[in-house]
Amino acid sequence: MSFDINWEQLRNDSNLNRTVTEKLNGYLTSINLPSYVNNLRIERFSMGDRPPKVTLRQITDPVQDFYDAINEELQMSAEEETEGSDDEGYGGDRVRNRGIDTQTVFPSANDVQFLVEMEYNGNMSITVTAEMVLNYPSKKFMALPIRLTISNIGFHTLCLIAFLSKQLFFSFLCDVTDPILDEDDSILDQNGPLLSSKGPLERISIIRSLSISTEVGEEYQGDGSVLKSVGKLEQFLKEKLKDFLRKEVAWPSWINFDFYEPEDNESDDNQIN
């Protein structure tokens, strides 16, 4: 069953765009950069105005992993509050306002999970800035500011989308060409080959296509050493973007968005004891 989504609302959601940008930048700061690049960061993320084609496969209750993740976060917040009871920061207020004692979230009748097939060939784009370092005739001889735009991203995957405790969870499960999909009954089996995995599937690629355009000063466009480094950086970015999706967003990892507002109270839909 196919259905439409309000893509315009999603693409204009500042919280969503900020979360994705922060997640990407957090990943970039955790990796070792090659010697020819410095200060690599995501400057802008745009969802684009062309939505993916989404086909609903199954509707089920959320998997237990999502509840465990929320409860672990709440437990950590409670411990931080105990250690710093005089601290009136956001984390402490959030725990108090939710009226949590045992820091446990239980399944609610309003919780829902969708298994969807998602095919995307839109105009999403990611703008990246960096400094191209020239190490000749000496180390770090010159640093050139450059801007790279990642676009024409295409993928066709099976995804898990869950709504619970005012949070949205999103995870890539596998490519639609994966032979594991021939065993439909085992897709959402928590003891099956997909959800029981403790690491990302080595065979999942997610991204089927993408392109990168690079802006560099006109005075360097004919410089062979600069162009060679630009080519290496573009290939490096492609590999790291694919690694990011596999390690940070593909099961058993996910990206989640918290829609909890401080003014919410114990009338929340979910049962929190």
Curated annotation (Swiss-Prot):
Pfam family, one: MMM1
Region called Disordered, residue ranges: 76-98
Record key words, sorted: Endoplasmic reticulum, Lipid transport, Lipid-binding, Membrane, Mitochondrion, Mitochondrion outer membrane, Transport
Coiled-coil zones: none
Residues of the SMP-LTD domain: 1-260
Keyword Calcium: no
Primary localization class, coarse: mitochondrion
Transmembrane spans: none
Gene Ontology biological process: aminophospholipid transport; mitochondrial genome maintenance; mitochondrial outer membrane translocase complex assembly; mitochondrion inheritance; mitochondrion-endoplasmic reticulum membrane tethering; peroxisome organization; protein insertion into mitochondrial outer membrane
Biased composition range(s): Acidic residues: 78-90
Membrane topology field: Peripheral membrane protein
Intracellular or extracellular location(s): Mitochondrion outer membrane; Endoplasmic reticulum membrane
GO cellular component terms listed in the entry, alphabetical order: endoplasmic reticulum membrane; ERMES complex
The protein's role, per its UniProt record: Component of the ERMES/MDM complex, which serves as a molecular tether to connect the endoplasmic reticulum (ER) and mitochondria. Components of this complex are involved in the control of mitochondrial shape and protein biogenesis, and function in nonvesicular lipid trafficking between the ER and mitochondria. MDM12 is required for the interaction of the ER-resident membrane protein MMM1 and the outer mitochondrial membrane-resident beta-barrel protein MDM10.
Subunit: Component of the ER-mitochondria encounter structure (ERMES) or MDM complex, composed of MMM1, MDM10, MDM12 and MDM34. A MMM1 homodimer associates with one molecule of MDM12 on each side in a pairwise head-to-tail manner, and the SMP-LTD domains of MMM1 and MDM12 generate a continuous hydrophobic tunnel for phospholipid trafficking.
Family named by the database record: Belongs to the MDM12 family.
Name listed for the protein in its UniProt record: Mitochondrial distribution and morphology protein 12
Native source organism of the sequence: Vanderwaltozyma polyspora (strain ATCC 22028 / DSM 70294 / BCRC 21397 / CBS 2163 / NBRC 10782 / NRRL Y-8283 / UCD 57-17)
